[in-house]
């Protein structure tokens, strides 16, 4: 389940986004008996407007947006899933978006999977390309319509405050061949990715319903990992 579900058009109408963030906070308290940290709330306040603006400017007001979508059998949450219909095939189509506010990042000890970020000291973080690829793989493994290729699934790491130069090392990750990493420098590219996956003239409610109501069918390896 997502902490907040809304059409892109409705999400844009919430600007300023205080009420949306308040709803997400209430849902988290209701479902998990805990409040998001101040840092997480600040993250929502900075990233949700950027995503909403780009969806609006891309002409995708009919798309359905799932914010903080929880993955099955884990507490991990996907920042956003944009749901709709693929413009070429007519099949359900989903864009998993990992939103980052970082302005710069570099590899940690030449390891493409780990990065250092300004303001976090020497505490390495996972490369967002690896993160979004893992989310897509996990989601597909638990969702038959995705694993059986009845629907489209694409992942994007969107560093909307960064420049290409400031995060150039991150593209050395092998997942750069299959996942997208987009910075604020390439906002047009991000919108083009969205338009290539989501039909602007079709409402995304059906695709979102299909994903949210899908039967969870975890593979044996994932069950073993969860048990461990």
Language model regions located:
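Accessory nucleic-acid engagement/destabilization modules that flank
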Residues: 1-212
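Conserved adenine-nucleotide phosphate-binding loops and their immediately adjacent elements
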Residues: 215-228
């Amino acid at each position: 389940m997502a902490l907040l579900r809304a059409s892109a058009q409705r999400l844009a109408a919430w600007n300023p986004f205080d009420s949306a963030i308040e709803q997400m906070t209430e849902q988290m308290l209701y479902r998990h008996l805990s409040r998001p940290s101040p840092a997480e709330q600040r993250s929502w306040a900075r990233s949700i407007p950027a995503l909403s603006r780009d969806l609006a400017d891309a002409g995708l007001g009919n798309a359905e947006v799932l914010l903080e979508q929880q993955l099955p059998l884990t507490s991990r949450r996907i920042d956003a899933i944009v749901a709709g219909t693929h413009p070429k095939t007519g099949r359900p189509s989903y864009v998993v978006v990992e939103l980052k506010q970082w302005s710069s990042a570099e590899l940690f000890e030449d390891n493409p999977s780990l990065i250092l970020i300004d303001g976090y000291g020497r505490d390495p973080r996972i490369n967002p390309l690896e993160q979004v690829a893992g989310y897509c793989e996990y989601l597909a493994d638990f969702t038959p319509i995705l694993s059986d290729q009845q629907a489209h699934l694409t992942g994007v790491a969107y560093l909307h405050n960064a420049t290409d130069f400031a995060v150039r090392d991150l593209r050395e990750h092998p997942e750069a061949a299959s996942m997208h990493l987009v910075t604020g420098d390439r906002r047009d590219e991000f919108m083009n990715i969205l338009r290539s996956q989501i039909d602007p003239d079709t409402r995304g409610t059906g695709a979102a319903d299909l994903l949210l109501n899908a039967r969870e069918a975890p593979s044996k390896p994932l069950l073993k990992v969860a048990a461990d």
